């Protein structure tokens, strides 16, 4: 991507990058489920926390290399690639040599309770995508914040998610996964209500932070839950739910944009609050159905 001379090649490169990243995302989650099962204790939230750390580190280091040290995008990319390859060479011997079941279907079509888990993932990722793209516009256009503060909403949301994922496994151990997921859904709804009805900056910031706390461990907990269902092989179940999640993060900004254009951003965020409430209802259904 740092070398492509045309837009068409850049699009092709990004498409290829997305395909391989999607495949890696599915595989590492399958690996995490198998490691968690073998260890006999909860580890998924912590693993997702390190995924968040990687995202922060990648964005932060790339900015540091280009802005502070004056490196070109190609030089920065080569350094990042070198770090990744080095880490892979160090840890590859510790990776499991087997997958999550015998499923080898070309397309992972969800069945049974996996469909409901997929919808929960869709809603969770949709909300994340919407906040990522629209929180800044909401703060600057609706509440007239300075442009320098446009990223505060998403930064607080992401920071809260990172913190809660590091403490997620301990929290789930003490409170139980059902309370964490259902309580997280309630917190997220309250966060959206604070954003919708709040006027003071502190209340708006608190709303984004609370949403981050609420949604942080929903996806890790449900990925762990996929290891306990027997409707589909783990590999296919994770792939199917991951597909729902990617659809959500793609649809989120577009859905909010459509609603904001048709009505306003208040109504769009109210729609997210309603979806989050539905997410909690679906989560309760999953737990009742699986007897967890």
Language-model-detected regions and their locations in the chain:
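C-terminal ends and interior cores of transmembrane alpha-helices
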Residues: 1-5, 187-199
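Hydrophobic core of transmembrane alpha-helices in multi-pass small-molecule transporters
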Residues: 8-24, 203-216
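Pair of pore-lining "gating" transmembrane helices in MFS-fold secondary transporters
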Residues: 15-16, 111-127, 209-213
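Intracellular juxtamembrane helix-capping segments at the cytosolic ends
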Residues: 22-37, 217-230
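Helix-to-loop junctions at the C-terminal end of transmembrane segments
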Residues: 66, 164-176, 260
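Symmetry-related core transmembrane helices of the 12-TM Major Facilitator Superfamily/SLC fold
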Residues: 74-92, 269-285
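Short amphipathic helix-loop junctions that connect adjacent transmembrane helices
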Residues: 133-149
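Small-residue hotspots at the loop-to-helix junctions and early N-terminal turns
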Residues: 147-155, 235-239
